[in-house]
């Protein structure tokens, strides 16, 4: 048998190739059979107790290992928790919140209060209610109405809008209602939403005054002064059909010079420079070889270039030089001193392109500031609706204390790249002041935050807050101040909300 494998190298045998696998397994079988004959007095080999015992041990160890791994996984998914020294504790069954002070557990009104009391930004440690019941308890503590959600955002730019939506009531002569919406985040400028630029304008009414809104600000206009209305391209319909403006939008828009007949000092008196073509206040026109004619007005110490609109307004109001502008040759005009005594920044270069308020009942003041820039950018948006995507209109939150007065926000929307950790700043685009700190909730409420390192660290608000104009921030529903002193208060009962609103349950 050995001779049959002596010529093969690297075959299927063991060791030096002196035996085959079949020979080895046969030998092992004979050894097991001999052992069974000596111990069991049997040689039929129907069963092998030793192998069964080995398999049983392997199966038991495997089952125990699987059970242990399953228990470990379940402890991560649904931990039972231990009280230990955790400062903030939550009942795993009911969700009730507790804060540990000394050797007692105090029911906490909210997470903000619990964090301020402990001075740590910990999340609640969930334990069984039976463990909580074994501990000594104290009364209710914390700030009523404080938030329990803290996930600060850090957008690259801060964007805020104050929007008016005018809705006409049914019936002839019925007053129009104005809904104020505050948008925190980027507006949707698709569709028919239009940013006013150039000669674009919106005409709105506040109380008894009419205002022309353009270039990010508002300018008052006398609705009865046709000498001004006609050159500006404003029709009686534009003025008479002007829709109301809320106090919120009125305060947001910076005021510009009034659109009226420019007041020329010492009008009618002789000019004080040589070669004056007429008295102070006279309008002069200079023909040009190419391009439109150039208009100027005579002042006491020189001439000031004006737009055709301003020249027409002055001419309509009547000038000391008569009903027609004085024609001055370019060579003569070049010898006259040039001055800038009149502020004419509110007047456009040409007639205004007034947006039809019936087709565009929504008007928004937009404030945006990018991180690292010194100045904010302000613009006015006009459109058929507020600049929110149609798919997101159901996410607009209606505030409970909405009264339609226009002094507070009726609705709030958090758009793309919104900011909820805020520092208030001035309304001027160049304002660099940083005032109070605020935390905003998804329900549209604002909470003042104590401006101390300990309070900010306890609430987990250590990132740099985003700027927001106070004129928009103040429109949100105010909440209590988040400070440690206000959190360290015990209560037997809580005050009742004196101005609640009914929750309508769908049938």
Regions found by a protein language model. Name each.
Residues 1-507:
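Short, surface-exposed polybasic-aromatic patches that bind anionic ligands, especially phosphate groups
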């Amino acid at each position: 048998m050995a001779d049959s494998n002596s010529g093969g190298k690297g075959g299927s045998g063991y060791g030096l190739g002196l035996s085959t696998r079949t020979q080895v397994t046969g030998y092992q079988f004979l050894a097991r059979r001999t052992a069974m004959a000596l111990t069991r007095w049997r040689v039929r080999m129907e069963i092998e107790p030793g192998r069964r015992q080995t398999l049983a041990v392997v199966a038991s160890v495997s089952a125990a290992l699987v059970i242990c791994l399953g228990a470990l996984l379940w402890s991560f998914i649904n931990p039972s928790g231990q009280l230990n020294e955790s400062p903030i504790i939550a009942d795993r069954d009911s969700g009730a919140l507790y804060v540990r002070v000394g050797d007692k557990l105090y029911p906490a009104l909210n997470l903000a209060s619990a964090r301020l009391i402990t001075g740590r930004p910990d999340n609640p440690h969930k334990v069984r209610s039976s463990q909580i019941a074994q501990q000594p308890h104290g009364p209710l503590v914390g700030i009523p109405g404080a938030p329990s959600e803290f996930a600060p955002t850090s957008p690259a730019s801060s964007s805020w809008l104050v929007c008016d939506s005018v809705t006409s009531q049914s019936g002839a002569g019925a007053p129009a209602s104005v809904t104020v919406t505050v948008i925190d985040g980027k507006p949707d400028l698709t569709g028919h939403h239009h940013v006013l630029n150039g000669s674009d304008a919106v005409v709105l009414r506040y109380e008894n005054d009419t205002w022309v809104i353009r270039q990010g600000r508002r300018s008052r206009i006398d609705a009865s002064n046709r000498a001004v209305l006609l050159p500006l391209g404003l029709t009686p319909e534009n003025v008479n059909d002007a829709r109301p403006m809320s106090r919120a939008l009125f305060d947001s828009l910076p005021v510009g010079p009034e659109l009226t007949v420019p007041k020329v000092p010492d009008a009618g008196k002789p000019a004080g420079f040589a070669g004056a073509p007429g008295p102070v206040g006279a309008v002069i026109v200079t023909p040009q070889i190419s391009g439109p004619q150039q208009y100027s007005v005579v002042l006491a110490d020189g001439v000031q270039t004006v737009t055709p609109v301003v020249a027409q307004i002055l001419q309509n109001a009547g000038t000391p030089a008569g009903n027609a502008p004085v024609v001055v040759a370019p060579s003569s005009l070049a010898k006259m001193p040039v001055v800038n005594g009149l502020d004419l920044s509110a007047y456009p270069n040409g007639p205004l392109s007034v947006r039809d308020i019936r087709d565009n009942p929504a008007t928004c003041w937009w404030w945006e500031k990018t991180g690292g820039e010194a100045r904010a950018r302000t613009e006015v948006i006009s459109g058929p609706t507020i600049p929110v995507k149609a798919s997101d209109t159901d996410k607009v939150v209606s505030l409970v204390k909405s009264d339609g007065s226009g002094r507070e926000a009726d609705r709030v929307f958090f758009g793309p790249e919104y900011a909820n950790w805020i520092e208030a700043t001035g309304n001027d685009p160049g304002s660099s002041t940083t005032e109070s700190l605020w935390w905003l909730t998804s329900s549209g409420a604002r909470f003042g935050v104590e401006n101390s390192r300990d309070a900010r660290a306890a609430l987990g608000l250590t990132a740099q807050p985003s700027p927001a104009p106070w004129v928009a921030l103040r429109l949100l529903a105010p909440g209590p101040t988040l400070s440690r002193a206000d959190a360290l208060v015990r209560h037997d009962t809580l005050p009742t909300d004196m101005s609640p609103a009914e929750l309508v349950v769908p049938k």
